[in-house]
Swiss-Prot record:
Cofactor requirements of the protein: [4Fe-4S] cluster
UniProt KW Amino-acid biosynthesis keyword: yes
Protein name: 3-isopropylmalate dehydratase large subunit
Source taxon at top rank: Bacteria
SUPFAM superfamilies assigned to the protein according to its UniProt record, in alphabetical order: Aconitase iron-sulfur domain
Record pathway: Amino-acid biosynthesis; L-leucine biosynthesis; L-leucine from 3-methyl-2-oxobutanoate: step 2/4
């Protein structure tokens, strides 16, 4: 009998029963809730006169709609200017109180983006199944979890039953071998992967990221890569449990205590792919050949490295790709063949569930070296992913490095990743962003998003245009 993949082991450990149609009933260990996708789910519970099946499995925090400007944030929910956004946060507060679900409220020191808060609090542990009404739930797969986003109706199902009906995906392994060069980060790795396989490359698969690059990568770096598995077409991205995983989890507030630790660790260490496991698809990439990446268009697969130029139509692999590029040239206000380093920028955003952890902020701060944000930059903001990240950064003096350089130091939240709160781009503005999506209008109507690493974003802020952080 062939060995099992990491995905197989996680699936089998949580499969309650197989169904006649080929689907399975899967038990869910951890359910993360926020203000946008939960109101109708709670309403459904109430109308059916149901209560959450397992209260302790649920944790909530507002993140999408919260203001990041300190003055507005100090007013709490009342500081949210948009009526709909304010109502969503108030509704989350009310529902959590009504159903007795634990919540890190807007100005709780533990509040933040759920995909940052979950791991840092130890709420997400190796071997778990984790769901949230948000597509970037794949982030948690970095801890050796089966984690994916769900819709609002499924949020209600999990609240009511702690289970979901799912169909098993195929297994894909993406191996990145060798060592990364100086100035190349986990964000560059995942952008390079998406550039290679496309945004549909992982469709129908659960992706396991493996190889020397991932073995050497920090836990926060792994989270960045798994976060963008969805941009590669997969609902699920994961990395096997190893010493890095165990060391990260130990001592977290919700992690097992000392008396339970040995047993928990022994169980967690079973979550890896067996040597003889068979994958439906295997892709290999030489990590030593990856350079800092920049997205130029309106899809995460429209990516080149910093030394290259916007591709020309004759480079397209088919007519559909050429049509997409032609539309992207127009929307982005770029010319085919234009050097990436010639793209002038208006705003800089360092944050999001992809790149707002302490290592990300350290990477960005290290680039500043006493320099100032370019006069041509209208706004450069740094938004920590959680209250705990913000406090740690301030304890290390990173906030002062940013503000002295001309960045704004904001309060935790999803911020400019998506145009759902007050942090938005104006039409035709170019933004170097550490977020995960560059679709048309993602950061504001007519806004032009370029996906980069925190270090590349910081360097771009200082130069006013994209530069190669390796030589900056």
């Amino acid at each position: 009998m062939a060995g099992q993949t990491l995905y197989d082991k996680l699936w089998n450990a949580h499969e309650v029963t197989k169904r006649d149609d080929g689907s399975s009933l899967i038990y869910i260990d951890r359910h993360l809730l926020h203000e946008v996708t939960s109101p109708q789910a709670f309403e459904g519970l109430e109308l059916a006169n149901r209560a959450p099946w397992r209260l302790s499995a649920n944790i909530a925090s507002p993140d999408h709609n919260v203001p990041t400007v300190t003055k507005e944030r100090s007013e709490g929910v009342a500081g949210i200017k948009d009526k709909v956004s304010r109502l969503q946060v108030l509704t989350l507060d009310d529902n959590c109180a009504k159903f007795d679900i634990a919540e890190f409220t807007i100005n709780d020191a533990r509040q933040g983006i759920l995909h940052v808060v979950g791991p840092e609090q130890g709420l997400v542990l190796p071997g778990m199944t984790v769901v949230c009404g948000d597509s970037h739930t794949a982030t948690h797969g970095a801890l050796g979890c089966l984690a994916h986003g769900i819709g609002t109706s499924e949020v209600e199902h999990v609240l009511a039953t702690q289970c979901l009906i799912q169909k098993k995906s195929k297994n894909m392994q993406i191996r990145v071998t060798g060592e990364l060069g100086a100035g190349v980060t986990s964000k560059d790795v995942v952008l390079a992967i998406i550039a290679k396989i496309g945004t549909a490359g992982g469709t129908g698969h659960a992706i396991e990221f493996a190889g020397q690059v991932f073995e050497d990568m920090s836990m926060e770096g792994r989270m960045t890569v798994c976060n963008m598995a969805i941009e590669a077409g997969a609902r699920v991205g994961m990395v096997a449990v190893d010493d890095t995983t165990i060391d990260y989890v130990k001592g977290r507030p919700y992690a097992p205590n000392e008396s339970q630790w040995q047993q928990a660790e022994a169980y967690w260490r079973t979550f890896y792919s067996d040597d003889d496991a068979v994958f439906d698809s295997v892709i290999e990439i030489d990590g030593s050949q990856i350079a800092p990446q920049v997205s130029w268009g309106t899809s995460p697969e429209m990516v080149v490295d910093i030394t290259q130029s916007v591709p020309t139509p004759d480079q397209a692999i088919d007519e559909a790709q050429e049509e997409g590029w032609l539309r992207a040239y127009t929307y982005m206000g770029l010319e085919a063949g234009q050097k990436i380093t010639d793209i002038q920028l208006d705003r800089i955003f360092i944050g999001s569930c992809t790149n707002s952890r302490i290592e990300d902020l350290r990477d960005a701060a290290a680039v500043i070296k006493g320099r100032k944000v370019a006069d041509t930059i209208k706004e450069a903001i740094v938004v920590a992913g959680s209250g705990q990240v913000k406090l740690q950064a301030e304890a290390e003096g990173l906030d002062a490095l940013f503000t002295d350089a001309g960045f704004e130091w904001r309060e935790p939240g999803c911020s400019m990743c998506l145009a759902m709160n007050a942090d938005k781009l104006e039409p035709q503005e170019h933004c170097a962003s550490t977020s995960n999506r560059n679709f048309e209008g993602r950061q504001g109507n007519g806004g032009r998003t370029h996906l980069v690493s925190p270090a590349m974003a910081a360097a771009a802020a200082l130069a006013g245009h994209f530069v190669d952080v390796r030589t900056f």
